[in-house]
Every structure is written in C-alpha cells, then in structure tokens.
C-alpha cells in the first residue's frame, strides 16, 4: 500500500492506525472535524483535511491513486447520542457517502468499523424486553 484515506483520523482508532501506516511508509490523507490535541505526529506522510464527512469531501481530497479508504469516523459513541436514532442514522448516511466517495475516487478497497452493539441484534428474538440503551435493542 502506498496511499490511503482515513476518516476519523484524529480519533482513538484512526490516529493509532495512521501511526502504524506512517511507520510503514504509507501516505495518509487524514480526515476529521478537528485535529486539536497531539494524537497525530507531524509527518510528511500525513495530509490533514479538517472537514465533516459528506459527499463534498471528494473535492477536498488530493487527486491521486488510493489503495484503501478506512472509514472510522462516527458520532455518538457514548452518552445520550448513542441512543439517539437521528445521530445514528446520520452515521449510516456518512458511511454510505464514504462508499460513494471511494467509488468516485476509484479507491481499491473500502474498510469500515462496526460496533459491538450490532451483536445484540442476534439475541433480540429471545429477549423478553429491550435494554432501551441503543437503537439496536
């Protein structure tokens, strides 16, 4: 791999991934709404784009060939937003937008993260009541 795109680049998982990629000489376009803090090192291998993730992102990414698109951006991972269907549906739209951006940019591979809460849906038919904590059940 030579060139990749990472959304959520300043988050816990995204910044950890970027550090590993850079250590292996991979050029990274890191996308996040902010790069406040010291999660990412200054590096010639990292291009930072401060932006939300929507269809307009494609125009902000430098032209070139990309081997992978890692979609790790996600809102509402804890607190009240975790149970807010509006926030979670916006996350789903963001993932769909990233798939379309990947296609538009001819990215070779698209990778995204899921949530442990998805596993709860497998037991839903057997539940007597739902937890009410998340939109999954």
Write out the residue ranges for each language-model feature:
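Conserved catalytic-core motifs of eukaryotic protein kinase domains, centered on the activation segment
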Residues: 40-41, 79-86, 121-125
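Residues at the starts of beta-strands that form the adenosine-phosphate
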Residues: 3, 27, 108-109
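Rossmann-fold cofactor-recognition segment
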Residues: 42-56
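N-terminal Rossmann NAD(P)H-binding glycine-rich loop of SDR-like oxidoreductase domains
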Residues: 4-24
């Amino acid at each position: 791999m030579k060139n990749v795109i990472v959304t959520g680049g300043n988050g816990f998982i995204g910044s950890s991934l970027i550090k590993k990629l850079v250590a292996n000489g991979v050029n990274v376009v890191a996308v996040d709404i902010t790069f406040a803090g010291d999660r990412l090192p200054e590096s010639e291998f990292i291009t930072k784009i401060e932006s939300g993730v929507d269809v307009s992102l494609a125009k902000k990414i430098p032209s070139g060939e990309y081997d992978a698109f890692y979609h790790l951006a996600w809102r509402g991972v804890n607190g009240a937003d975790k149970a807010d269907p509006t926030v979670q549906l916006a996350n789903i739209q963001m993932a769909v937008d990233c798939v379309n951006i990947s296609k538009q940019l001819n990215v070779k591979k698209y990778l995204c993260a899921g949530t442990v809460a998805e596993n709860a849906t497998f037991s839903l038919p057997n539940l007597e009541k739902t937890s009410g904590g998340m939109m999954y059940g």
